[in-house]
């Protein structure tokens, strides 16, 4: 059971922590602590939701202790790997531009946009992870996307 939970959720939790920290070593430390805490609480439902909630709290706690504000920086490694070289370069430039814009928006908007559009969670799942209402998730998503569009010059594809 534990191995199955780990294998089913490792990648999603890893990516989430990595997006929040942009630090591979810290990501591995927090990932280990996330699964440790999860296993000691014996959650049986909504495993991924609880894992992400634990991970989020660990990231917050880490930066609160360090007194670091504005710590969000996405990994700038190229993501697009398929297509013609010109297309790959163009797509990677767009991704870096988007990540740069994400760094400039409020944390609560940033986190909702990451969960909804990068991690592809539903409104309900996002609300459970963030411990807030679905209405707040919808409002922050709309506001976050609006700010991103403004930062990216009104692009509709955000």
Language-model features: where?
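Residues within helix-turn-helix
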Residues: 25, 124, 135
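Acidic, proline/glycine-rich intrinsically disordered inter-domain spacer in sigma factors
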Residues: 77-103
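DNA-recognition helix of helix-turn-helix
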Residues: 128-154
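A short, charge-rich alpha-helical start-of-domain segment used by transcription regulators
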Residues: 1-15, 19, 25-28, 104, ...
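A short pre-motif secondary-structure segment
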Residues: 112-116
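Hydrophobic-face residues of short alpha-helical interaction/recognition segments
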Residues: 13, 17, 51, 55-63
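Structural recognition of an alpha-helix C-terminal capping motif at a helix-to-coil junction
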Residues: 29-36, 45-57
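Arg/Lys-rich amphipathic alpha helix in sigma70-family domain 2
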Residues: 56-74, 91
